[in-house]
From Swiss-Prot:
The keyword Methyltransferase belongs to this UniProt entry's keyword annotation: no
A matching Pfam family: Ribosomal_L3
Similarity comment text for this entry: Belongs to the universal ribosomal protein uL3 family.
Gene Ontology molecular functions: rRNA binding; structural constituent of ribosome
Species this protein is from: Mycoplasmopsis synoviae (strain 53)
Name of the protein described by the UniProt record: Large ribosomal subunit protein uL3
Organism lineage: Bacteria, Bacillati, Mycoplasmatota, Mycoplasmoidales, Metamycoplasmataceae
Amino acid sequence: MKGILGRKVGMTQIYSETGTAIPVTVIEVKPNVVTKVLTKQSNGYEAVQLSVFDKREKLSNKPETGHFKKANTTPKRFVKEIRNMNGYELGQSVLVNIFSVGELVDVSGTSKGKGFAGAIKRYNQHIGPKSHGGGGGSQPIRQTGSLGDISGNRVFKGMTMPGHLGSEKATLQNLEVVKVDLKENLLLVKGSVPGAKNSFVVVKSAVKGLPAKAAVKLVDVKEVVLMNELVEKAKKLNVEVKVGMHSDELRPLIEQAELEAAKEKEGE
């Protein structure tokens, strides 16, 4: 098992070489610090405590500050244990590149809070009849149905009734890792992820152990836009553009052609 802590940035879409638009969630994964190593002998189970995102020292108490000093780091905002994650030492950093492109992961977060909701929205119950006497009064169309047998003389726990919706732990399984950006500390996973923007999430290797998918070859949209602009300039200056040419290769040729054109104008 391996895992890492991060923060949901939001959703966007990227493009593959075949032109397919892939909806992805961007997760900011700054270097996680191992702030505690739990062993079976001392704690009864094996786990690693990860911490990420700095917190002001005045907002942490002395025991908390001392705990982070043992790992030679500053107080952190987001702290979680990842079970059965072996091979790490106290104070060691865990980077986003522990996951690879095509790997399947489980992402856990806190779902968006919806406040007080009825049984139709909360449990997807069927709406009541809108005609034949079901439009209101004693039979409103959004009212809950039966709450149990009359012989029970009470409402049993667990009945589907109105109440608070959302703001609870939710996990989406088998999300594909589309891109790993070590330079910007970003992880892009295919599809949506529980929680609002800037909410904390936990990314773990998939529990179901399904095989990884083939890495998708992505297109750099900025590079494509830049190349289109350079190709138009190249046509005007009669610069030869070869198939598969990169902008770094084409730009010097265009600059050289522009200098030659400027010299010709001066000579005239």
